[in-house]
């Protein structure tokens, strides 16, 4: 089950990757920016069809070779599922959840039947051409079931969503806490998609993220509080790790941490920072999770409201500024959070003598020069994963290599970190996650090339 959820979380990355560009288009077309209606409507169209985009993206993400036939099957499945369930009961609105179901149907159908050979007189429909046909048949059967069972499920989801929204800041704080606690397992994407794309409805769009860009005055509850963490808190934690580093390693540590901090501040990608201390001190990471939950509670209590299309970095802060509420106060909260994070990290690192970057007893965690990254991926990283023979599947999400290996005991964490990995997670069974950062796609391609 854990492996399935991790794979599902990874598959969310393709459709989510579309949203930053769409967010920029939407922002540029808004009345308060350039007031270009056709540009604004072009961006709105994507948010209006998020379920279809998720169906296509998840189908491709689930498929073993990311083939377009899986994406086509996902689109067919969603269109059929949506139309059929609404015919059975007009109140049915599976929204993004319908897209997820359709993507799963198409992805697993593709994996199972993509190599199927039919008799010669039906040979044209063999292999990948067979997948959309079988997907359609399976979808019709499941649509009949979902058309009947979905209304009570939808009622439960709506009730839970209304209950969480009714909790206000407390509910937002609980979400923020678990959002961070699930990162080590890579399951935070699953939680995020429930809150950001499913809960609440406004003018036909669902989820906190889509509702915010549709100008729902109540949206932003589950996004706003991440800005103080990602733009200010974690960059301040980087500063604390630089200050507490050994004098002989402070310059090298600063070079690495400045890059991490800028990435977090500008884009909102924070995993490279979090994995620098996550496993060194679970207590420190737990404090970080609590502070995240507290941030979501505080900004809600102060009546601050903002949102993002990708993550809570400076880019999305600027793009959302025109439709945000009290955006300047959000910066003040962020500055306060920077002070809190610096003090907490400085004190705990010193008091617990944590071996954060720059405080190691040996050089196993040193990151090699950027000029040797390609060689690292082909040699040291491959060796750290137990060699070609140990690798079964190679995939990735936004910041992590997601691998399946024959024997996790052969995975050498010290070697992987020496190769530039920010962290390693053995998440049960044969699954291994290697945290790389925003350039993970290139690392995955180089690793695939190395094992051929």
From Swiss-Prot:
PTS EIIB type-1 domain mapped to chain residues: 375-452
Cellular compartments annotated: Cell membrane; Membrane raft
GO molecular function: kinase activity; N-acetylglucosamine transmembrane transporter activity; protein-N(pi)-phosphohistidine--N-acetyl-D-glucosamine phosphotransferase activity; protein-N(PI)-phosphohistidine-sugar phosphotransferase activity; protein-phosphocysteine-sugar phosphotransferase activity
Family annotation (Pfam families): PTS_EIIB, PTS_EIIC
Reactions listed under catalytic activity: N(pros)-phospho-L-histidyl-[protein] + N-acetyl-D-glucosamine(out) = N-acetyl-D-glucosamine 6-phosphate(in) + L-histidyl-[protein]
UniProt entry keywords in alphabetical sequence: Cell membrane, Kinase, Membrane, Phosphotransferase system, Sugar transport, Transferase, Transmembrane, Transmembrane helix, Transport
Enzyme class: transferase
A GO CC term attached to the entry: plasma membrane
Top-level taxon of the source organism: Bacteria
UniProt xrefs under CDD domains: PTS_IIB_glc
Domain spans labelled PTS EIIC type-1: 1-361
Alphabetical list of SUPFAM superfamilies matching this protein: Glucose permease domain IIB
GO biological process: N-acetylglucosamine transport; phosphoenolpyruvate-dependent sugar phosphotransferase system
InterPro entries in the cross-refs: Glu_permease_IIB, PTrfase_EIIB_Cys, PTS_EIIC, PTS_EIIC_1, PTS_Glucose_EIICBA, PTS_IIB_1, PTS_IIBC_nag
Topology versus the membrane: Multi-pass membrane protein
Name used for this protein in its record: PTS system N-acetylglucosamine-specific EIICB component
Organism of derivation: Bacillus subtilis (strain 168)
Protein encoded by which gene: nagP
